[in-house]
């Protein structure tokens, strides 16, 4: 009886480790690309070796003011190898209804944004853009935005380092500390 229980316990322990494998990364972030707001290809290979913050953005959201912090973060660390990339999405409350041209004008006029902003995309569900599918497949459900201004931090090796929800501001101690650690 004791041996049977011990064997069952060992088998359960062995199988419990099967699902805990490290992300395989069939592709790295730098192998992906997307169109920018002007319709030109934005190849992420140009960011190889840099630390990158991906943010799904929206013009009519309670978190839209985070554009200010994103631009400041970009200006502060871009010369050290840091990039912010904005991904407009209309999936949360219809808060990004504008065309690419309107989004670009809004960002430049209201926030002086000069970091890359992509074509408007889906960031969750079966229609999610390849970038967000890649993040989910390699980092799990915490990489899937629950609302606008969800942040995904990519390390210099092209892998997801961490994610931050909408309530975590771009210039928060948590994000700034992590970026500084990654840049040093």
Locate predicted features.
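Thiol-based oxidoreductase modules, predominantly thioredoxin-like and allied folds used
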Residues: 81-98, 114-125
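Hydrophobic h-region of N-terminal signal peptides that target proteins for export
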Residues: 12-20
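N-terminal "domain-start" segment that seeds a small globular fold
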Residues: 22-45
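Sec-dependent signal peptide recognition
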Residues: 3-10
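Conserved helix-turn-beta segment immediately C-terminal to the redox Cys motif
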Residues: 50-51, 60, 65-88, 108-111
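Short, internal strand/loop/helix patches
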Residues: 28, 101-148
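Thiol-/selenol-based redox modules, centered on thioredoxin-like
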Residues: 130-133, 137-184
């Amino acid at each position: 009886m004791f041996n049977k229980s011990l064997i069952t316990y060992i088998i359960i322990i062995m199988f419990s480790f099967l699902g805990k494998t490290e992300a395989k990364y069939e592709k790295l972030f730098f192998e992906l690309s997307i169109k920018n707001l002007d319709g030109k290809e934005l190849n992420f290979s140009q960011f190889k070796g840099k630390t990158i913050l991906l943010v799904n953005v929206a013009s009519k959201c309670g978190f839209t003011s985070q554009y200010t912090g994103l631009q400041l973060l970009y200006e502060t660390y871009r010369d050290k190898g840091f990039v912010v990339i904005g991904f407009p999405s209309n999936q949360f409350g219809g808060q990004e209804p504008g065309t690419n041209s309107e989004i670009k004008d809004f960002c430049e006029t209201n926030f002086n944004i000069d970091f890359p902003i992509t074509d408007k995309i889906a960031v969750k569900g079966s229609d999610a853009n390849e970038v967000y599918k890649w993040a989910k497949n390699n980092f799990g459900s915490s990489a899937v935005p629950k609302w606008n201004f969800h942040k995904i931090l990519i390390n210099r090796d092209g892998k997801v380092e961490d994610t931050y929800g909408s309530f975590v501001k771009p210039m928060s101690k948590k994000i700034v500390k992590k970026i500084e650690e990654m840049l040093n």
